[in-house]
Structures are given as C-alpha cells and as structure tokens.
C-alpha cells in the first residue's frame, strides 16, 4: 500500500493536487559538463527568441550575470503547445552560495539559492525508480478503493517529496541527485490522453521543493523512453547524439564532478555498440578522472524477481567486457525495485551469444519477443541463463576494499514506495547483499580523491538497511 503521512501537510497536498499536477513549467537543475557549470531546463507556454537565466551572489540579484540558451518547440499538453527552454550557466566556484532566476513567459521568476560543494569531497543522493504513478491499482491506507492513475500520481509525488526532504534533513552534505531512470510511470507513447497523464506525473516529480536547489542527473528508464518529454524537461550535458539506436526520449550523456566521471547510458537502446562508443568517448575526453561511474536503468547484475533473469540482463554479456576494458569502478542501476549489491565482478573474457535476433525492433519498454521465448521454451531459458554467466567474482571482501579488481554493481530499491518487486527465489552467486524491506530507501554516496563510500537508508526512519561499502584507490 502507498504510505501516507500522518501530518496535516497531507491534507494540504491533496487539496492542492490539481494545481500541482498542471504546473508543467517547473525548473529542473542538472549538473553541467563539469563542476563549474550548471544546466537548466523548463517548459514555457510562450515562445522566446532565447531562453534566459541570470546568476548572482545575492538574493536581490544585484549585478546578476545573464546566460542565454535555446527555446524550441516541445511537448503538446492537452492541445496546448509548450516550449522547451535550455540554458547552461558557468563560472561556479567551490563552496559558494549563488542565486538564480529564470525568465518564464517574459517574466523573471522568484530567485532561488544554489550552493556549490567541494569537488574534492562531495556527496550525492542515489535513488531508485521514483516512478510517480506506479501505485495505481493499489489500495491506500485511507481508502478501501483501488487508486486511479491520477490518485496514484498524487500519492507517489507526495511520498517523493517526503523522501527527498527526509534525506536532505539527515544528510545536508548532499550536493546533487542521481536517478537511474523511471522518473514517471506512464509510458504514453503516441496516446495523447496518456501523454497528459504522463505530464501530470512529471509535474508531481518536479514539484519536490528540494529541486529548487538540488541538481539532478537522471537516466532514461523504460517508462520514460517512449516520448520526448524526458529530453524536453531535462537539459543533460554532453548528450551522445551519435547514438544510432536512440529512443525518442533522448540519448546517453556524461559529465564530471571533481575527480569523478559519470557516464549515463540509455540502456533502453539494445545496441551495445552505441554504449561502447559513449563510454570510450567519455573516458578519452576525461583520462585523468580518478573514478569512473556508469549510471543505467536496467540492472544487468540485480536480484529482483521481475527482471534479473530475463529482459534486464539482455545486455549483460556485452556490457560487462566494455566496462572492464574501460576500467569502470561502479555501476549504479535501478529497474528491479529491490536492493542488491554485488561483489567485485570482472568479465571472464569468453565469447557469448548476443541474442541479436531478440533485439531487432525491441527496446527497454518492448521486449515481448524475448519474454515470449523465455516463457514458452524452457531449453531456451536455460541456454539464455548459461550465456549470461559471463563474469568472474574477482573479490568477495566486504567493508572497505583497497585497490580491488573488477566492477561494483548496485541496484537501488524504490525511493517512493510506488512499486516493489519480490526478490528472485535463488540468490545469485554474484550478490553480496540484498533485501526487500517493502519501504522506500535511498543511498548516499561520498567521493573523495581516493575513496568511494555508499550507505543506504530507510527513507522514513533514516536508519541504515545495510553496512557501508567502501573502495579506496591509491
């Protein structure tokens, strides 16, 4: 069931939901291509010659500097044309407080604060599948009736606000947020009525007050990949437009923050050659990055019942050697709505079937050809499983590892509680720890020039659900 708060703000949230869900013009802050930059994305009803943001070091916006970007045709919502505004601002210094304003429909909006952190010692919040609207059909605590899609979006967006506020109150050191995808639940596709519902969900997702000050780096999930809304809302840095099999939502991208290189893969694209090219390009352009972190939606090494032995691993035996060859340290995943972390894994160096015939015309939101074959042919399923034993467990130590070999994979559970899956019955040998608490969780990752540490917490109580895992590189 969807959790609700006992506090009075729940009543206020319900009363204001119709305004919240139709507020399509909310601003998303996104990390820039490096620490000194910050990207902005927002919808507007009016077309402008250029999008404009201004930055100052005071809330009165005296001596503010203007930055200009693009304003292009975006999403049509309920018959109304909206425009997608994108701006990049630069010149940000460490440990400094700034204020920003965006110009919306010809008027400057309220100024909001943005604080930079320390690029040599920073933290980010890592969340799994907020998937606003996914609790549809569930029976909430205060009713005996199954939730409609609209009520589900309302409740999930409320819980999303709660998770973010709780995390930031307990961990004020958080500098930005990373989501491996599925910000919303409704795929929509070409259905205008469903697309309206999808935009309600995006409004609920972006309504979080934390996002007025907190940049977010989000991947494309399978529920995000069928419309242009993702790329219209989020102004991602270094989009990999050379991707040959991209989805309409957009592309993979990459950015640096301090000593870390983040490579965000659009794993709904089943062409591994595209992902290889993106990883190699990002690494080549940032050869001195101490940490190399991949973010992707599908969990090629997870432990959820729904995906970790089926469509979720269709790219495993191709991506594993790519990550090895490019010295990736960590892969942050979602998709399976369960918690799991692996041992240090490497490719076993062998050649495997890439199941190309099951990828033609298929993608992250449509993999019926593979699903049907796995369900109808037990011999094929056994073969499919055998061809995904493409890894070697390089190190089984726990706690703090020093200069370990291999890649660490993590799958995050739902940050909103909108949807959970069971764990797969037989725990895989690559899994070091896993759980399903049926409660929203989030992780906080701290990175210094020589140490990576991840801790995961219950969103309501703030208590750890697992021991810390750290990697030291010397």
Which positions does each model-derived feature cover?
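Acidic, histidine-bearing metal-coordination/catalytic regions of metal-dependent phosphoesterases
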Residues: 1-147, 169-170, 402, 420, ...
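Acidic/histidine-rich helix-loop elements
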Residues: 66-79, 126-162, 187, 191-194, ...
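Extended active-site neighborhood of metal-dependent phosphoesterases/phosphodiesterases
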Residues: 86-89, 97-116, 139, 144-150, ...
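Active-site-adjacent substrate/metal-binding segments within catalytic domains
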Residues: 126, 159-178, 184-189, 265
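Active-site neighborhood of phospho(di)ester-bond hydrolases with catalytic His/Asp-centered motifs
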Residues: 126-128, 176-182, 216-222, 265-266, ...
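Active-site environment of divalent metal-dependent phosphoester hydrolases
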Residues: 132-136, 184-188, 220-228, 271-273, ...
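Short acidic, glycine-rich surface-loop motifs adjacent to enzyme active sites
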Residues: 180-187, 286-306
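Catalytic-core region of carbohydrate-active enzymes that cleave or remodel glycosidic bonds
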Residues: 200-208, 314-336, 439-440
């Amino acid at each position: 069931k969807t959790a609700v708060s006992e506090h009075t703000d729940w009543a206020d949230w319900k009363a204001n939901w119709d305004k919240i869900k139709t507020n399509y013009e909310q601003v998303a802050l996104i990390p820039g291509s490096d620490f000194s930059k910050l990207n902005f994305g927002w919808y507007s009803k009016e077309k402008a010659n250029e999008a404009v943001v201004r930055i100052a070091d005071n809330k009165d916006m005296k001596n503010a500097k203007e930055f200009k970007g693009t304003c292009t045709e975006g999403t049509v919502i309920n018959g109304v044309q909206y425009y997608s505004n994108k701006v990049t601002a630069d010149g940000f210094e460490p440990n400094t407080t700034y204020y920003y304003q965006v110009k919306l429909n010809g008027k400057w909006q309220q100024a909001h604060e943005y604080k930079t952190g320390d690029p040599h010692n920073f933290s980010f919040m890592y969340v799994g599948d907020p998937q606003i609207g996914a609790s549809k059909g569930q029976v909430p605590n205060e009713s005996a009736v199954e939730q409609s899609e609209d009520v589900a979006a309302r409740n999930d967006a409320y819980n999303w606000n709660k998770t973010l506020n709780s995390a930031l109150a307990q961990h004020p050191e958080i500098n930005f947020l990373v989501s491996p995808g599925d910000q919303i639940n409704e795929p929509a596709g070409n259905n205008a009525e469903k697309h309206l519902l999808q935009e309600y969900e995006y409004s609920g997702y972006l309504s979080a007050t934390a996002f007025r000050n907190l940049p977010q780096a989000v991947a494309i999930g399978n529920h995000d990949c069928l419309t242009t809304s993702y790329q219209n809302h989020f102004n991602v840095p270094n989009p990999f437009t050379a991707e040959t099999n991209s989805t309409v939502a957009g592309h993979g991208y990459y950015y640096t923050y301090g000593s870390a290189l983040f490579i965000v893969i659009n794993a709904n694209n089943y062409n591994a050659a595209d992902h290889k090219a993106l990883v190699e390009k990002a690494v080549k352009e940032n050869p001195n990055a101490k940490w190399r972190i991949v973010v992707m939606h599908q969990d090629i090494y997870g432990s959820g019942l729904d995906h970790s032995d089926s469509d979720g691993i269709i790219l495993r035996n191709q991506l594993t050697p790519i990550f090895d060859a490019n010295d990736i340290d960590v892969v942050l995943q979602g998709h399976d709505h369960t918690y799991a972390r692996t041992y240090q894994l490497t490719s076993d160096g062998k050649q495997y079937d890439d199941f190309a015939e099951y990828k033609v015309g298929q993608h992250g939101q449509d993999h019926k050809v593979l699903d049907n074959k796995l369900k109808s042919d037990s011999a094929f399923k056994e073969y499919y499983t055998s061809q995904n034993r493409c890894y070697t467990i390089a190190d089984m130590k726990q706690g703090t590892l020093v200069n370990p070999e291999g890649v660490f994979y993590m799958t995050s559970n739902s940050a909103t509680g909108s949807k959970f899956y069971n764990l797969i019955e037989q725990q895989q040998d690559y899994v070091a720890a896993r759980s399903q608490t049926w409660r929203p969780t989030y992780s906080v990752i701290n990175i210094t020039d020589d140490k990576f540490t991840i801790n995961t917490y219950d969103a309501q109580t703030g208590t750890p659900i697992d021991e810390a895992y750290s990697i030291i590189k010397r």
